[in-house]
From Swiss-Prot:
Part of the ABC transporter complex MglABC involved in galactose/methyl galactoside import. Responsible for energy coupling to the transport system. It is found in: Cell inner membrane. Residues 14-249, 264-506 form the ABC transporter domain. It comes from Escherichia coli O157:H7. This is Galactose/methyl galactoside import ATP-binding protein MglA. It comes from the Bacteria. GO terms for molecular function: ATP binding; ATP hydrolysis activity.
Amino acid sequence: MVSSTTPSSGEYLLEMSGINKSFPGVKALDNVNLKVRPHSIHALMGENGAGKSTLLKCLFGIYKKDSGTILFQGKEIDFHSAKEALENGISMVHQELNLVLQRSVMDNMWLGRYPTKGMFVDQDKMYRETKAIFDELDIDIDPRARVGTLSVSQMQMIEIAKAFSYNAKIVIMDEPTSSLTEKEVNHLFTIIRKLKERGCGIVYISHKMEEIFQLCDEVTVLRDGQWIATEPLAGLTMDKIIAMMVGRSLNQRFPDKENKPGEVILEVRNLTSLRQPSIRDVSFDLHKGEILGIAGLVGAKRTDIVETLFGIREKSAGTITLHGKKINNHNANEAINHGFALVTEERRSTGIYAYLDIGFNSLISNIRNYKNKVGLLDNSRMKSDTQWVIDSMRVKTPGHRTQIGSLSGGNQQKVIIGRWLLTQPEILMLDEPTRGIDVGAKFEIYQLIAELAKKGKGIIIISSEMPELLGITDRILVMSNGLVSGIVDTKTTTQNEILRLASLHL
């Protein structure tokens, strides 16, 4: 299926037309188009697995396209590497930043193309040119600072400045705001608009609809490897884009709430982490069947709460009471034995073993329970439980031997949640559970969470997405600079109240 709306003729910086790419048994791209104008910000949207990454890999020469044409500034191109693309004016700022943490900012800016004076690197010239670019983009970073000492948002600014230094005409940004505060997002948007004013074409990839409508001029939607539409944002609604992405209308963004919170199962009093700055005097209750959200700005120490409960961080004071009995989780194993489970924020770095199969990733948190009387692993039980994870979590995969890194983000997250459910937890803690997941898969994750709450699990969710917290939780605990600034009832609170509480102790 394709839309009747096609990009109108006109001057384009980048024209990708009729791009096809197949892998054994799979047609990854089927006659896909992407056309980007100068002085524009162009959203590239689609569910995970829609073909966005494959299309861009064809542009950068990582994959060789089967057919189709790519024109850049009116000339046909066929790059063989990302380096060649960059040298010719096409740059990409990746979600996983590609910087050398041990080197200085200006080293990273000019790596592989240092200005020289005789036989030596011209440090003064490198500093001056880096500073000039930073000044033009309103970036307040010391060019001599070591990259490893900077925040994620500052690192992203460096990546954008690097693209600027190559005089890039096309800049592709992949989920650039996933780890940024609202203030940092606004600064990033200012820089993106500066690039637009200078004549750049920006390709902006994000699952955050609010950002797309705030920033972009046009949108191209892909689905199942096909081009669906390219349209101006001004004539679209959020529901229309979602319908194009998923192939159907999503009548609601969040499932109906059918859980009924019961008695208190977890009492946390004056919890303080040993290594400061961290959480201080955190107190709250969690009820059976309740979904408790944790809100706060970046740096509020939200993650420190669940890490301290799970034994990753050592507590210096406070009590944790489970079913009326005081417990101490000195490490993750003790936490698991007490019925806690933690789905971590950084899925790819701490949640999955990307190059191993679904079976391994499903069972690793519970692996010792599969040993038989002679100490060998019970393969039939392992296979059965892996299949349970696939079926009950509705994981889309050819089979349990599939490498988990090849799955979409949503399906990876389902496997991780299923893995923890095999440990039979009473308390499931999820840190940014839908980060980097497309809108259709988000709804499926919300459904799973709602079903678990309905079955009586106590659930704690940390999220930076306010609509998510307001859409699925029963109560929201708001953190500010390591302190609890309030606990609000989701039904009666507002986004403004939560933001006010989040700023209380800054």
